[in-house]
Amino acid sequence: MEELFKERKEKLNIIKNLLRKPKEEKKATNNTSNIPEGLYTKCPECEQGFLSEDVQKNFYVCPGCGHHFKITATDRIQMLVDKDSFREITHRLKTQNVLGFPNYTQKLSHLEKTTGLNDAVVTGVAKVGGYRVVIGVMDSRFLMGSMGSVVGEKITRAIEYATKRRLPLLIFSASGGARMQEGIVSLMQMAKTSNALAKHNAAGLLYISYFTHPTTGGVTASFASLGDIMLA
């Protein structure tokens, strides 16, 4: 315990010492250039700085002003499900540039490397409070969470998985809507996901839909608005 407090104190001292520098010196060092990556988080609303682990423990809500930080799909899953219970499904599906949209393939490749995701949603099976559930979490870092063929397919398969095994379904939406680079193919996903949810509903199963920032366009007009319970 003593070592833990010592390590925490050292981290806080690094931040305090840098923040105490004269303005000219701060500017020269670009404010946070000497802070180890991932240690420090600055709130865009109140501009206060905090240890990243404190922000994480506060569920990504600013301890100073209550601002809600954006949450990655991976972080949200870790926050929500029982420890070590999540198992990803349909993770091998990858988007193809079927319409030959300019620079789309390059964008996908770049985002895969920077986010560690293969598209804008992560789906899987997990336990929440000991109960088995199927969960889908969108990530706005990947092309603003837009819904293309792979996103629509992954969500549809997750719904079908839940229906077949008679499991409740949780989906966290964070999307700018249908993906323009896939044209009519992306719009088809609205009908496909809605149809799968109709069957899940007909089986008398629970679907809880969570609207997170941002949730707009074709996602709002399809699966996001079809929950038995909807939270925002």
Where do the PLM segments sit?
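Gly/Ser-rich catalytic serine loop of serine hydrolases
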Residues: T212-S222
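Short, solvent-exposed amphipathic alpha-helical segments in soluble enzyme
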Residues: G152, S225-L226
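Terminal-region recognition feature
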Residues: M1-I208, P214
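Gly/Pro- and small hydrophobic-enriched strand-loop and loop-to-helix capping segments
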Residues: G227-A232
